[in-house]
From Swiss-Prot:
Disulfide bonds join C4-C44, C6-C34, C27-C45. The keyword Endoplasmic reticulum does not apply. Binds specifically to voltage-gated sodium channels (Nav), thereby delaying their inactivation during signal transduction. It strongly stimulates mammalian cardiac muscle contraction. Paralyzes the shore crab (C.maenas) by tetanic contractions after intramuscular injection. Its main location: secreted. Expressed in ectodermal glands. Not expressed in nematocytes. Belongs to the sea anemone sodium channel inhibitory toxin family. Type I subfamily. It is found in: Secreted. It comes from Anthopleura elegantissima. The lineage of its organism: Eukaryota, Metazoa, Cnidaria, Anthozoa, Hexacorallia. One of its GO terms (cellular component) is extracellular region. This is Delta-actitoxin-Ael1a. One of its GO terms (biological process) is regulation of signal transduction. The keyword Disulfide bond applies.
């Protein structure tokens, strides 16, 4: 999957670890949405 920025990672992608994975069809079982706003397409999820 494509890494994405969770809310807990910090405000921007610069210098922060991207701990989430981008899922287009929603978070799979056992994962949760870790970004309150965005991304525009898909969901940023982490285990």
């Amino acid at each position: 999957g494509v890494p994405c920025l969770c809310d807990s990672d910090g405000p921007s992608v610069r210098g922060n670890t991207l701990s989430g994975i981008l899922w287009l069809a929603g978070c799979p079982s056992g994962w949760h949405n870790c970004k309150a706003h965005g991304p525009t397409i898909g969901w940023c999820c982490k285990q």
